[in-house]
From Swiss-Prot:
Keywords: Cytoplasm, Lipid biosynthesis, Lipid metabolism, Phospholipid biosynthesis, Phospholipid metabolism, Transferase. The gene is plsX. It comes from Escherichia coli (strain 55989 / EAEC). The lineage of its organism: Bacteria, Pseudomonadati, Pseudomonadota, Gammaproteobacteria, Enterobacterales. It is an enzyme of class 2 (transferase). Transmembrane segments: none annotated. This is Phosphate acyltransferase.
Length: 356
């Protein structure tokens, strides 16, 4: 394994360094080839490194940043005032080649805008998309995008997302000839928005995409598709609804419950069922798949949940490691070159793709 250097925006997210710094130490313990650049306020970071041993400290470097982009600031305002912020400095480290990827739990819109500004989209990609890999009931995985980077998406963007998601499923998740579906309100051809129907028509003409049609939201965790494509608004609502239901379900399994006194054998049976079911469904725990990759850029950027705990942020760091090792941006670029002649005409010097 080759050595990797990642830039962490340790000030971003709901909990800042209190979560991100311990998660960084956890990631270093798991990967001896990893070096981390901790971007943020040194006064907030240094005390949290007290438990780090000499070997860990040799693979850590604090990169000072003057400010933090708040989560409630509009992206346009955040970008204008971003100079010296921990998020921007972390992305600049990737741009300059000092880091191979950036991980942040900060403002999603600001991260999207700054990443596009500093790292630039791949040729043929109009706008990057947030993508994650979710577990399903058949113990496999489904790639889902967009999860919030683009609220409004036209058919061109949906087709581009399908191409990128297919590459990620094949190259990173290692699913041969992955099935691709569009999230819709029904399976019938006449259902859905014009953008979805137009994207469906184009996807049917691309030989390298194994397009299977529409999928409804209630089938997200069934394993019927390997890649699910939607606009960012729909994807974000779908993901957070699913996570809320899963967390509630796992919480109920662990709950001892209140009520009248039961016999010892009923209590024993209940505890056995709790442990058995918790193990059975533990793979659905959202903490295990935290970290959405901002796909379609000339560099690797991972967006962690703002409310991520230490374990979840460490998972996001691991997502960045995998994306770099599998050379995801380079593989997407190669696939785009082979796909575009079949259904796209590149305009504006390759900065955007338009359906023809």
């Amino acid at each position: 394994m080759t050595r990797l250097t990642l830039a962490l925006d340790v000030m971003g997210g709901d909990f800042g360094p209190s979560v991100t710094v311990p998660a960084a130490l956890q990631a270093l313990n798991s990967n001896s080839q990893l070096t981390l650049l901790l971007v943020g306020n040194p006064d907030a970071i240094t005390p949290l490194l007290a438990k780090a041993d000499f070997e860990q400290r040799s693979r850590l470097q604090i990169i000072p940043a003057q400010s933090v982009i708040a989560s409630d600031v509009r992206p346009s305002q955040a970008i204008r005032a971003s100079r010296g912020s921990s998020m921007r400095v972390a992305l600049e480290l990737v741009k300059e080649g000092r880091a191979q990827a950036c991980v942040s739990a900060g403002n999603t819109g600001a991260l999207m805008g700054l990443a596009k500004l500093l790292l630039k989209p791949l040729e043929g990609i109009e706008r990057p998309a947030l993508v994650t890999v979710l577990p399903h009931q058949q113990k496999g995985k489904t790639v889902v995008l967009d999860l919030g980077a683009n609220v409004d998406c036209d058919s061109t963007m949906l087709v581009q997302f399908a191409i990128m998601g297919s590459v990620l499923a094949e190259e990173v998740v290692e699913i041969p000839n992955p099935r691709v579906a569009l999230l819709n309100i029904g399976e019938e051809e006449v259902k859905g928005l014009d953008s979805i129907r137009d994207a469906s028509a184009v996807l049917k003409t691309i030989p390298s995409i194994n397009y299977i049609g529409y999928l409804e939201a209630n089938e997200l965790l069934t394993g019927k598709t390997d890649v699910l494509v939607c606009d960012g608004f729909t994807g974000n609502v779908t993901l957070k609804t699913m996570e809320g239901v899963v967390r509630m379900f796992l919480s109920l399994l662990k709950s001892q419950g209140e009520g009248k006194k039961r016999s010892w054998w009923l209590l024993l049976l209940k505890r056995w069922l709790q442990k058995s079911l918790t193990r059975r469904f533990s793979h659905l725990n959202p903490d295990q798949y935290n970290g959405a990759c901002l796909l379609g850029l000339r560099g690797t950027v991972i967006k962690s949940h703002g409310a991520a705990n230490q374990r979840a942020f460490a998972v996001a760091i691991e997502q960045a490691v995998q994306a770099v090792q599998r050379q995801v941006p380079q593989r997407i670029a190669a696939r785009l070159e082979s796909v575009y002649p079949a259904g796209f005409e590149l305009l504006d010097g390759g900065k955007s793709g338009t359906l023809r």
